[in-house]
Swiss-Prot record:
Intervals, Cytoplasmic compartment: 28-332
Membrane topology category: Single-pass type I membrane protein
This protein's encoding gene: zipA
The protein, known as: Cell division protein ZipA
Quaternary data: Interacts with FtsZ via their C-terminal domains.
Biased composition (Acidic residues): 51-63
Location in the cell: Cell inner membrane
SUPFAM superfamilies assigned: Cell-division protein ZipA, C-terminal domain
Low complexity bias (residue ranges): 99-115, 123-149, 160-175
Principal location listed in the UniProt entry: membrane
Function: Essential cell division protein that stabilizes the FtsZ protofilaments by cross-linking them and that serves as a cytoplasmic membrane anchor for the Z ring. Also required for the recruitment to the septal ring of downstream cell division proteins.
PANTHER family: CELL DIVISION PROTEIN ZIPA
Topology feature Periplasmic, residues: 1-6
Amino acid sequence: MMQDLRLILIIVGAIAIIALLVHGFWTSRKERSSMFRDRPLKRMKSKRDDDSYDEDVEDDEGVGEVRVHRVNHAPANAQEHEVARPSPQHQYQPPYASAQPRQPVQQPPEAQVPPQHAPRPTQPVQQPVQQPAYQPQPEQPLQQPVSPQLASAPQPVHSAPQPAQQAFQPAEPVAAPQPEPVAEPAPVMDKPKRKEAVIIMNVAAHHGSELNGELLLNSIQQAGFIFGDMNIYHRHLSPDGSGPALFSLANMVKPGTFDPEMKDFTTPGVTIFMQVPSYGDELQNFKLMLQSAQHIADEVGGVVLDDQRRMMTPQKLREYQDIIREVKDANA
């Protein structure tokens, strides 16, 4: 309930404020229109009074040169006539006195006190409107545009040499440190291709164990190796041992030799190696070598390792193949 009452009071107050604003605007507009509407009548009345005043002067003095008076009755001189009219005692002066604009200034006691025409309501209305409208306005705009033009003229003259000086300043340090010549990198020489290599792989027992010698010798013979030179096993081109040797097998324990008559011996593993280049196709010989190593590892329960005695990986096998191709290209 209180909110509704507050809302009603706010609305009523807003309406009252708007009504006051509209009434004030309407009243000021009405007064302004009436002031502009009465102004021509006042001007006609003042002009008519001036004409009657001039006719009286002509009748009293009888001089025809009084018409010069009418030429000087411009609106800008309305103030001078209004100041001269309140003194009827001096109408006997010669007519040329009214044509001179400086005589009212020479007789200040006569022009200072106009007792009859001072209370006119029309004079205070005309004076504030006409004086600022005609006298000061044409003089001020002529002086104002002249001063900024003269002031702005020297600015571009003084500002012109500044960029020129700034342009020459960075050019003064002629002996600027020149960048030191960068040494050209030495041409990278192509690594000479190897003309021979040794491909090595191992068959070893699991960590902490050893291979049985009798079982190992049987698996070696089943893989096609034949005991031969240097007391090690060789894989020849033909399974019966004829033809050149493709790759060989040695004991991992020094001196790396075998004794076929010894049945009860153990070893941590064996090493299979192939000299490249070799007889025939080296890549095919490498595949046969890998198959033999896997066969022996499966028979004795061991694992196939690379030349670093790490688990053989596909990446290492591709590396071996790349080495074989490089040697073949070098010997082509």
